[in-house]
């Protein structure tokens, strides 16, 4: 999916948490309804078949409970996207990536090939299943991962065995580490540990810009990869490091150069998003003018950086909601020209489906350590709400999304707010910001209060209390969301083209 990701190491976050956040965006012209769900071990398949690629995978018989954010409309798979399992391991999948022709030739993607002819007749060729995709990955990995590294290992094994039909980036987290895995061609992959003191920005483009093969093949302190990566790169002359003798590759090389893309479309769709996110978190750099360190179309924007100050939940929400505020590229702004204001793809876009921020707090007990912050609809107009992940059920307000449009659940209420507020952006802006700040403040207080309330409880009683707290908070969010919907509906209604000032029925 055309998503945007930010990862924050524990020493770069405001409270020592590991933070994994990703927008799930639908394709252009598609708006995919989403909902929250808790998947129990008896609901997890033991034999899984992908809808899109027709791949069948046998799964272990010991899955853990996990949270997910699946699609509502059936017919094209689960698309579980993001969640935590019982061991407080988080996974977010996937960020669709780009690659280049050399990689496509060296290790072709594993596409589904339909059957030809009729079975039993001459010339019949049976269908060939494709590999793994975004549809499948959380379902196949998260219920079994015992740590972030273990998640990398499980997915890596699956990729080497079954392959993939698309290029993807996947994040894994636990309370100590975040790992980022990028698929390379059909069967190869690399993974890198996010530095504890840094953040990572990821648009839809292969991102890792430095990789240590010796570490990946040895201690794996910060790097992991598919078993034959070095030999495969040498055979296909994929390393572009200057000065490397023979077939290479160099011990330390740049995967973005070797495996990635630098296309014209990247410069309007991908690099501007990384540029703006890093502009927000490292504002002292020069971002504008002829002496800029990086421009919106730079190909060398770093994969990871140390922020100028610690990164908060609100910082993450802001950058993942952004439309280039304060620049000539803001689609709602007055700077620049009509051409510049539509030049680059916003991060907060009309087709944001959901935003999941996975927070693992080292100071909280394991029974209530994991908090999954959620928002639905276009991020420029929605608010993040926290949910404790160690629960058996999710509140109906977040879980009962249907294909039918209604204001009775969080997904559709936010979709309606976004569509109404967009057309009167400046008139609705104050009400939207007030809502975002109020709900955000309510969320932080909710976590503080519930932490204190469950701290002395026996561990077995904690999940039920967390579920009650999630439900009570959802009802408060419903009240605030309904109020905002009423405000933006009123504002937009007053500005309708067919309005007329004269009336004859004054109450």
Language-model-detected regions and their locations in the chain:
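Short Pro/Gly-enriched beta-strand edge/turn motifs at strand-loop
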Residues: 60-66, 152, 334-342
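Short, well-ordered beta-strand elements within core beta-sheets of diverse protein domains
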Residues: 138-144
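Glycine-rich, aromatic-lined ligand/substrate-binding cores of catalytic
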Residues: 231-368
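Substrate-recognition/cap regions that form aromatic- and gly/pro-loop-enriched pockets
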Residues: 324-325, 329-456
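Short, charged, surface-exposed loops that flank catalytic or proteolytic processing sites
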Residues: 144-150
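Histidine-centered catalytic/metal-binding microenvironments
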Residues: 436-507
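A contiguous strand-loop segment
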Residues: 2-134, 154-289, 293
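Soluble extracytoplasmic regions of secretory-pathway and membrane proteins
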Residues: 21-35, 96, 181-183, 319-330, ...
């Amino acid at each position: 999916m055309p998503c945007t990701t930010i990862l924050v190491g524990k020493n770069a976050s405001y409270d020592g948490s590991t933070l994994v956040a990703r927008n799930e965006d639908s394709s252009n012209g598609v708006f995919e309804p989403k909902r929250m769900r808790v998947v129990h071990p008896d609901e997890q398949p033991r034999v899984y078949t992908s809808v899109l690629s027709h791949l069948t995978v046998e799964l272990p018989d010991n899955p853990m409970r996990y949270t997910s954010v699946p699609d509502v409309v059936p017919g094209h798979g689960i698309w579980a996207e993001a969640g935590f399992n019982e061991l407080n391991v988080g996974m977010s999948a996937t960020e669709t990536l780009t690659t280049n022709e050399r990689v496509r030739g060296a290790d072709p993607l594993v596409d589904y090939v339909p059957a030809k002819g009729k079975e039993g007749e001459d010339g019949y060729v049976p269908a060939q299943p494709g590999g793994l995709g975004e549809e499948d990955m959380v379902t196949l990995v998260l219920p079994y991962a015992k740590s972030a590294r273990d998640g990398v290992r499980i997915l890596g094994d699956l990729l080497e065995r079954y392959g993939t039909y698309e290029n993807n980036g996947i994040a894994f987290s636990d309370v100590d580490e975040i790992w980022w895995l990028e698929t390379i061609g059909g069967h190869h992959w690399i993974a890198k540990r996010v530095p504890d003191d840094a953040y990572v920005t990821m648009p839809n483009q292969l991102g890792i810009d430095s990789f240590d093969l010796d570490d990946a093949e040895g201690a794996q302190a910060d790097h992991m990869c598919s078993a034959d990566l070095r030999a495969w790169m040498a055979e296909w002359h994929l390393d572009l490091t200057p000065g490397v003798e023979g077939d290479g590759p160099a011990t330390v090389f740049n995967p973005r150069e070797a495996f990635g893309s630098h296309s014209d479309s990247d410069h309007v769709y991908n690099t501007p998003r990384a540029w703006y996110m890093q502009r927000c978190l490292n504002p002292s750099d020069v971002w504008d003018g002829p002496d800029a360190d990086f421009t919106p179309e730079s190909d060398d924007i770093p994969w990871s950086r140390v922020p100028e100050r610690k990164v908060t939940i609100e910082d993450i929400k802001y950058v993942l909601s952004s439309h280039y505020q304060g620049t000539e590229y803001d689609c709602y702004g007055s700077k620049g020209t009509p051409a510049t204001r539509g030049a680059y793809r916003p991060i907060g876009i009309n087709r944001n489906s959901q935003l999941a921020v996975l927070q693992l707090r080292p100071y909280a007990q394991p029974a209530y350590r994991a908090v999954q912050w959620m928002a639905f609809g276009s991020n420029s107009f929605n608010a993040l709400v926290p949910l404790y992940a160690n629960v058996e059920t999710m509140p109906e307000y977040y879980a009962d999304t249907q294909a039918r449009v209604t204001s009775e659940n969080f997904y559709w209420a936010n979709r309606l707010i976004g569509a109404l507020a967009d057309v009167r952006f400046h008139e609705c802006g104050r009400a939207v910001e007030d809502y975002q700040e109020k709900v955000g403040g309510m969320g932080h207080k909710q976590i503080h209060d519930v932490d204190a309330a469950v701290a002395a409880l026996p561990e077995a009683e904690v999940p039920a209390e967390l579920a009650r707290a999630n439900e009570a908070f959802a009802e408060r969010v419903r009240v605030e969301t309904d109020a905002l919907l009423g405000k933006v509906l009123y504002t937009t209604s007053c500005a309708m083209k067919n309005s007329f000032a004269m009336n004859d029925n004054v109450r």
